[in-house]
């Protein structure tokens, strides 16, 4: 309610078309938010697409598969990644990750995908290194520690008796994971994913370094520079 009241003067002057207009021309009082909205949603989606399965694997390994001597140091190492300032991720992404990403991923994948209908459009264009796809990958690296830590904690809440009973009737490790651990912890897993999504949507500095900060939406290519609401 407070947000609607505060934004009402803007809505009255510019209308709701502000949300789907891509032109931004301050001298002529034309303001469109489509470009940053699109950039924010797409980079966050890419980040979740990468981070969720990786975090899931890390959490399962730490709780069900890793030997006892490895669980604690590896868990601490994952948590330490969450303490790295976002500007460090951004600078690393711009100066180290982006050049390698352009040469070893964007160029070969672009050549392979270029002749595939629809999908090829997502990987077309020059390999800049920076852009929407690169920003999504950096965001994924940033949110993996958060999602993995939450998933690990909720997996550890599964009652030991339930797992031991499943093992007692002959279930394998993977059967225990899929039939006991996951059904018991699904709400916590969803909560961890939502935490990661919130982190991705609100990230500023790392995205500012790597997304390209170009106010344009002339191509569907994920290689193209873009913009986000926070950057």
At which residue positions do the language-model features occur?
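Membrane-interfacial helix termini and adjacent extracytoplasmic/periplasmic loops
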Residues: 5, 10-34, 90-141, 211-212, ...
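Glycine-rich helix-loop "coupling/hinge" segments at transmembrane-helix boundaries
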Residues: 200-231
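Transmembrane helix-loop junction
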Residues: 63-64, 95, 99, 103, ...
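Hydrophobic alpha-helical elements at and bordering transmembrane segments
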Residues: 33, 37, 41, 74-80, ...
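Cytoplasmic-entry segments and transmembrane alpha-helices of multi-pass inner-membrane transporters
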Residues: 54-93, 163
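Transmembrane alpha-helices
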Residues: 69, 77-80, 84, 88, ...
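Transmembrane alpha-helix signature in integral membrane proteins
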Residues: 31-61, 193
């Amino acid at each position: 309610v407070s947000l609607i009241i505060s934004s009402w003067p803007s809505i009255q002057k510019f209308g709701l078309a502000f949300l789907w207009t891509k032109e931004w021309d301050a001298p002529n009082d034309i303001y469109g938010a489509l470009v940053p909205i699109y950039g924010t949603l797409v980079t966050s989606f890419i980040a979740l697409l990468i981070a969720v399965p990786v975090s899931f694997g890390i959490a399962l390994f730490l709780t069900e598969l890793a030997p006892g001597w490895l669980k604690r140091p590896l868990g601490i190492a994952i948590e330490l990644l969450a303490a790295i300032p976002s500007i460090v991720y951004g600078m690393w992404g711009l100066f180290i990750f982006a050049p390698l990403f352009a040469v070893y991923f964007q160029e070969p994948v672009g050549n392979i995908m270029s002749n595939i209908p629809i999908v090829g459009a997502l990987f077309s264009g020059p390999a800049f290194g920076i852009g929407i796809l690169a920003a999504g990958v950096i965001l994924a690296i940033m949110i993996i520690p958060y999602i993995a830590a939450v998933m690990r904690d909720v997996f550890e809440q599964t009652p030991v008796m339930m797992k031991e009973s499943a093992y007692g009737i002959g279930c394998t490790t993977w059967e225990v994971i899929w039939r006991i651990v996951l059904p018991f912890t699904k709400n916590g897993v969803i909560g961890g994913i939502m935490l990661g999504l919130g982190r991705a949507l609100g990230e500023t500095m790392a995205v500012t370094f790597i997304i390209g900060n170009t106010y344009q939406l002339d191509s569907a290519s994920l290689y193209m520079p873009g913009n986000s609401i926070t950057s």
